[in-house]
A protein has these predicted regions:
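Conserved helix-turn-beta segment of the N-terminal RecA-like "Helicase ATP-binding" lobe
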Residues: 31, 38-64
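Switch/connector loops and helix/strand junctions flanking conserved nucleotide-binding motifs
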Residues: 41-43, 69, 83, 130-135, ...
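Post-Walker A helix-loop "phosphate-sensing" segment adjacent to the P-loop in P-loop NTPases
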Residues: 24-31, 52-56, 119, 146
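Hydrophobic residues on the short alpha-helix immediately C-terminal to a glycine-rich phosphate/catalytic loop
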Residues: 16-24, 44, 111
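Structural beta-sheet core signal
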Residues: 5, 33-34, 123
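Post-DEXD/H (motif II) to motif III coupling segment of the RecA-like Helicase ATP-binding lobe
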Residues: 93, 101-166
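Conserved helix/coil segment N-terminal to the catalytic DExD/H
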Residues: 63-94, 105-110
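Walker A/P-loop
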Residues: 1-22
């Protein structure tokens, strides 16, 4: 089961990641969630707690935190893990990449390659470069692209405020 989900701002990316994580947990799969910054590790962890997840399931991995995995769900920056050997990644049955458009970076591609036994791969992004090569690389890592909803649809459903731009020139 694989997929690359394009989700604009305010479309509920963290809730989607939480839902995928709960599903993987129900299948007894250890889940690795990769985010680009330590502040996003903290934010994602906090969001999970807000959604009702227990802190005892979540392990945050970044500078100053243990990298020995002892919990079912690991939220980490890719910078904290990219030098680890392939064997380290064999424990994960699911990987979820937040801000997946950044996974074209060599370090991130290296991590995804080391997750060769990982059957469940999901990437989420608010933006996707127009370059066909970039899209093909991401689809190779995560699976086919699925547009969840557009910003226009979110505005029409009144989830987002209407956008109005006045030119000053």
């Amino acid at each position: 089961c694989r997929g690359l989900f394009v989700c604009p701002t305010a479309s509920g990316k963290s809730l989607i990641i939480y839902g995928l994580t709960r599903w993987c947990h129900s299948k007894n799969l250890k889940t690795l969630i990769l985010v680009p910054t330590t502040s996003l590790v903290e934010q994602m962890s906090s969001d999970f707690l807000d959604y009702g997840w227990l802190e005892s399931y979540i392990q945050k991995v970044y500078s100053g935190h243990s990298k020995k995995i002892e919990k079912d769900v690991v939220i980490s920056t890719w910078q904290s893990l990219h030098k680890f050997p392939k064997k380290y990644f064999e424990q994960f049955g699911c990987v979820i990449g937040d801000e997946a458009h950044l996974f074209k970076a060599k370090s991130l591609t290296s991590i995804m390659t080391k997750l060769h036994l990982c059957k469940y791969r999901f990437g989420l992004t608010g933006t996707l470069d127009d370059l066909q090569t970039h899209k093909l690389v991401l689809e190779g890592l995560f699976g086919t692209t699925n547009k969840v909803i557009s910003t226009k649809e979110l505005i029409e459903k009144k989830t987002l405020s209407n956008l109005k731009i006045d030119s000053l020139i």
